[in-house]
Amino acid sequence: MDQHFQVRIRSVFSYAVRLVDMYTRGAPFRSSLSVRLANHPQVPVCKGDGWYIFSDLPDGIYTLTISSREYIDRSVSFSVITGRTSYTESVIYLHPSPAYPFRTGDSLIRGRIFVEDGSPTGGAYVQAVISYERDAPVRLAEDADKEATELIIASKKGQVDLADAFLLETPTCKGTIIRFASPPKGRVYPLTEPLSFAYPRGTVLLPLLETYCDDRGEFVVALPLFLEKTHARMKIEVRREEAAGFAELSIQAGTTQSIGTIQLNRPK
């Protein structure tokens, strides 16, 4: 008589990462997306909505590499420890590359970065700060004390996205880059780090946009959608090791603007 056996194979969860398109805040384009471990053959299971799951990894430290034609390459390290009671999950925001399929009418700033000898520089960090001529959409609704761990925000654009970064700055207070740690309770937003300085009620939260250059030294900054009817200027700062470059321009919503080239210079 034939005997039949049912075998169940159980996988042990190791690591999960959610990839998010920094521009759309949704799942990234997958046409050229590669999500792999450096020096390890396992391929993750894609669960949809940008989630990638690794299972049954031996204990150790791993490097996850993310590459795509549409996004700037990323890498992140994580560890696997057998018996860990808490799950290891991460959210990684992917910044659009110059090859990203933006739509007609999107507000874009494009440029190229060169070093002093005229050659392009890849991987340079690009930081763009938006300042308003009027009608700033996000402000402090109450005074913020030094060492404050949360802010009370007044926003004309609805709830502020946790992926957003801002610069707090006044003529008498040094600038501080802030990020929010978790969803707000009403208008109260917890900070990832306490404030280093105090800021008065009404201080504008200046949107801070970040990206990197590709291997050819090219970059693109996509403006937030809520800027469509706002008069604003943008200050761009580019850094690579000790070298830095700067540019400034008026924003024209609904257009693609080129600032040409920015040269990186080392301090003398």
Report each predicted region and the residues it spans.
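Exposed aromatic-hydrophobic patches
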Residues: 51-56, 152-154, 191-192, 218-225, ...
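Autoprocessing Asn-cyclization modules and mimics
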Residues: 98-198
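Short, acidic Ser/Thr/Gly-rich low-complexity loop/linker segments typical of extracellular
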Residues: 26-56, 134-136, 208-220
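Beta-strand-rich domain onsets/edges
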Residues: 1-14, 20-23, 85-124, 129-138, ...
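A short, solvent-exposed beta-strand micro-motif common in secreted/extracellular proteins
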Residues: 58-70, 217, 228-242
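Structured interaction patches on ligand/partner-binding surfaces of diverse proteins
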Residues: 70-91, 240-261
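Short proline/glycine- and polar residue-rich coil/turn motifs
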Residues: 46, 80-86, 143, 182-184, ...
